[in-house]
């Protein structure tokens, strides 16, 4: 009887640890398609490869999400010419109906679409059984690597939110600018001087 209880306790512990796992960062960004209200057209994340991207998942009625969208609008205008792009996806039920009013009200200078919750959870590597706190903000570099991912309860969204977002964007743009260009095939190799 004691052995059975021990086995059950260990199994429960192992399963609970699985559900508490955080997303792996950095990691390669999988493809992600954001639905739009223009029929069958989707926004493919891969079409922004080569740009630094902030992908924000929101609830259109969430005040924290609205505040972050406002900050990201400012950042899009400031950093867009340097290769930065914001993409947004609403994930609430009936999001397809809520997005047009949200866009009209907040007028973000970037695409806003919608997705079902499960596809977003998969993309975020967020366990289905855990609460999803909004907004969810993902920073992707020009090589399509997720460099940072923040949940709505993270200190990142505190009083210094704008400063934190700016620092992430500048880091993405700086890191990708510092990446050396590949040499053409057949280019002579540098010799080490000893």
Task: Give residue ranges: language-model regions.
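Bacterial N-terminal signal peptides that target proteins for export
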Residues: 1-9
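Hydrophobic beta-strand anchors of alpha/beta hydrolase catalytic cores
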Residues: 54-55, 86, 137
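Bacterial N-terminal signal peptides
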Residues: 8-18
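N-terminal "domain-start" segment that seeds a small globular fold
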Residues: 21-45
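Thiol/disulfide oxidoreductase modules built on the thioredoxin-like
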Residues: 106-108, 117-164, 168
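Compositionally biased, proline/threonine/alanine/serine-rich low-complexity intrinsically disordered stretches
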Residues: 177-194
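Structural microenvironment flanking redox-active thiols in thiol-disulfide oxidoreductases
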Residues: 66-107, 117-123
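Short active-site neighborhood of thiol/selenol oxidoreductases, capturing the structured segment around
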Residues: 44-66
